[in-house]
Amino acid sequence: MARQTPISNYRNIGISAHIDAGKTTTTERILFYTGVSHKIGEVHDGAATMDWMEQEQERGITITSAATTCFWSGMGNQFAQHRINVIDTPGHVDFTIEVERSMRVLDGACMVYCAVGGVQPQSETVWRQANKYKVPRLAFVNKMDRTGANFFRAVEQVKTRLGGNPVPIVVPIGAEDTFAGVVDLIEMKAIIWDEASQGMKFEYADIPADLVDTSNEWRTKMVEAAAEASEELMDKYLEEGDLSKEEIIAGLRARTLASEIQVMLCGSAFKNKGVQRMLDAVIEFLPSPTEVKAIEGILDDKDETKASREASDEAPFSALAFKIMNDKFVGNLTFVRVYSGVLKQGDPVYNPVKSKRERIGRIVQMHANERQDLDEIRAGDIAACVGLKDVTTGDTLCDEKNIITLERMEFPEPVISLAVEPKTKADQEKMSIALGRLAKEDPSFRVRTDEESGQTIIAGMGELHLDIIVDRMKREFGVEANIGKPMVAYRETIKKSVEQEGKFVRQTGGKGKFGHVYVRLEPMDVEEAGKEYQFAEEVVGGTVPKEFFGAVDKGIQERMKNGVLAGYPVVGIKATLFDGSYHDVDSDELSFKMAGSYAFRDGFMKADPVLLEPIMKVEVETPEDYMGDIMGDLNRRRGMVQGMDDLPGGTKAIKAEVPLAEMFGYATQMRSMSQGRATYSMEFAKYAETPRNVAEGIIAKFQSGGKKGDDE
């Protein structure tokens, strides 16, 4: 089967935004105008097509990035048909991981901002992730029909808050309830959308007299931005004072692809105005798969040679599994982005991360949660495969004759955990299946069994994250569970270097045990130490035989899992084995593993050990009247206020760093202090030393409950 759409006419885009910027409504309109969805789904009714998990519809927030395909030939059918693959991404900070993983497979992004709220906290997080993956982007300022809407303020905030370089290509006609359409600065005409056809039809009109000066001013800025793309354009602009429509588009496109500028548009998705022009901008300014840097990976050879795969059907097949979902009808759905080559139904694929060969069952393309079967997918496509058993998020799939491992995704360590217990014996088995599946779908969610209590502990990125996991266990798998109180993921580390002997000797008649080591423990930078540990050896003259180095390393690492102070994992330590002794008969791996473990345990307590706690970046938006109460409350929670911003309408944004341990139940407290008018967002910032008075309480509690961290 030949390719239906040339790869140069593909656009793989993500739509990302802060919670209430109207992202799902914007995506809905995209599906409506591109002819996929005939009844517009409104989030207010809990009926949006993209929000396809029940909880998302109830909570009105988007949790999972559903991938959808649609086609667009321009508002006035001025382009050849383009295929746009849209990945809807969540706007809540607990789901930053979802944004991260969709950024990884996108070629371009459309940032949606609220014309009233402007650039909000989550927008900054998403912007940073887009920078990290060098994703070209444009911005759409939505909700121009709302009271307090101001397009130019949002443009200014992209500059000041995000460090972006925004270039508006439209200016709004009116605002709030007088918002009527936009002036297209490239065409220098007003675009008026027809309300009777829900914006499917439009007409060009003359620019309203009161907007002529504003339009000229912003057009000049836009043309200057385009001229900076090349010397030829700049020379022509300096000579003639203007550029042609084609030159403006080419200049802006080149600079957008180089991530030097961000084209900005505006509209009201709810009122069916502006999304159509934004779709045209996606085609005009965002890259096709062939215009982004070829994906890089590592070949399957001794030297782990770096290699890349061009976006071409002729290249060997390579794809990245970026999301796994459990579907009650077909089982596991693995969403893949194909970077090169062709994959047909029934083909074998190789997973170099797991060293496993699998066969593709069905290939389906998703439109929100409806699916269409495909015979094959090609370079640039995003689709879901059915029947893959051992694939997890971030794995590579490739042709087994041309093995390549694409760059892996990095997932953050969870910062909050809680115990879950099934209510009945019947729930026990269902719960372990449910948690296994959910952990496979979401790499930032972890499940483990506490060795002492035997309890099942689930860990994630925030309270909402774990709430939703528990909710999904109940809805999708019918598991009733009792939930414990949330627990903070503390860590332990040291502040000074020590040298420590560790000895393990057992004589019981016959063959004994003998392991003897000297280990140096040194602190590493705690700021960086999410999970850091280094092992080195400086043994001279064979005092410890080489074959036991690994055992010493293993003994130390196992001991680090349950720290010495309060049983929490140890981070930020460099351990160096530098001396010891051995016995020809009695020494073995186990003896040296135990000797390493003892040296670590005893040395740790002499090295000025401290407890680390997760510190969260908290941003509260509140009417000025409640600011004093909110600031006082943050201080009581050991918060450090970092700064304040004035927002429109007398609202203040307070930025602070607060220990996670003090943030439980914050939402309820904040609502009651502000009569429900304040909102907040929270994301992990760093680990920092826990104040002594707080740490003493945690350590005392641990010690009175029996020494979890001791192995003698």
From Swiss-Prot:
Record's subcellular location: Cytoplasm
GO CC annotations on file: cytoplasm
Record-linked CDD domains: EF-G, EFG_III, EFG_mtEFG1_IV, EFG_mtEFG_C, EFG_mtEFG_II
Family assignment from sequence similarity: Belongs to the TRAFAC class translation factor GTPase superfamily. Classic translation factor GTPase family. EF-G/EF-2 subfamily.
Binding site residues for GTP: 17-24, 88-92, 142-145
Protein name as catalogued: Elongation factor G
Nucleotide-binding in keyword set: yes
MF GO annotations: GTP binding; GTPase activity; guanosine tetraphosphate binding; translation elongation factor activity
Pfam family, one: EFG_IV
Role summary: Catalyzes the GTP-dependent ribosomal translocation step during translation elongation. During this step, the ribosome changes from the pre-translocational (PRE) to the post-translocational (POST) state as the newly formed A-site-bound peptidyl-tRNA and P-site-bound deacylated tRNA move to the P and E sites, respectively. Catalyzes the coordinated movement of the two tRNA molecules, the mRNA and conformational changes in the ribosome.
InterPro entries: EFG_II, EFG_III, EFG_III/V, EFG_IV, EFG_V, EFG_V-like, EFTu-like_2, G_TR_CS
Origin: domain of life: Bacteria
Record key words, sorted: Cytoplasm, Elongation factor, GTP-binding, Nucleotide-binding, Protein biosynthesis
Main location: cytoplasm
Residue ranges of domain tr-type G in the record: 8-290
One of the GO biological process terms: ribosome disassembly
